[in-house]
Amino acid sequence: LCPQNHVIEFMTLLVILKISLAGLFFGYYLKEHFEKNHAAISIFATAYALCGFSAAYAWDIMWLDCMMLAPLVVLGLEQLIKEKKVLLYYISLSLCIISNYYIAIMVCIFQVIWFVITWLENKETGIGAWIRFAIYSLLAGGTGAILIIPEAITLGASGSQNISFPDTMEW
């Protein structure tokens, strides 16, 4: 993909791209959520992109994927509840799970909390919102399972299979 002597520059470019897209996607989320195009959106989008998480984990670029996709997942969830649109939620959550299932677990926990809060504000959507949320969350998880299950099988068959905690601790 890139010459060996430019790997560091390529990785730096990827980090910059992911952090920039995180800010862009968060700005888009704020614009759609509040239905306003205000100058403060740029400030908050920049603050999100340059938050402590991105600074602390820029060395592990996989962890930036879910940070980048999280605003789209939340926007997709809001569209799923309010407008019965499911595509953005399904695609962004699937990509989040595929890109890094560890951070995606935290995103999914947040989605459950955010779903309940958003649904309580929009109770008129009824039980249909719950059904859509469950179905498309499970579909996104199933889509992610295409990679997660083979990874789990491979890890189970590797040398790390027999690693366990010690029975006793001796001081």
Language model features by range: what are they?
Residues 107-139:
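Perimembrane helix-loop-helix junctions
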Residues 13-34:
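Transmembrane-helix motifs of polytopic, lipid-linked glycan transferases
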Residues 58-64:
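Short acidic/glycine- and proline-prone juxtamembrane loop motifs at membrane-interface regions
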Residues 73-88, 120-121:
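Membrane-interface transmembrane helices that cradle and orient dolichyl/undecaprenyl
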Residues 27-50:
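Transmembrane-helix signature of polytopic, membrane-embedded enzymes
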Residues 1, 129-171:
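Periplasmic/ER-lumenal interhelical loops and adjacent helix-loop junctions
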Residues 87-101, 139-142:
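Membrane-interface alpha helices of multi-pass inner-membrane proteins
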Residues 1-13:
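Juxtamembrane segments of multi-pass membrane glycosylation machinery
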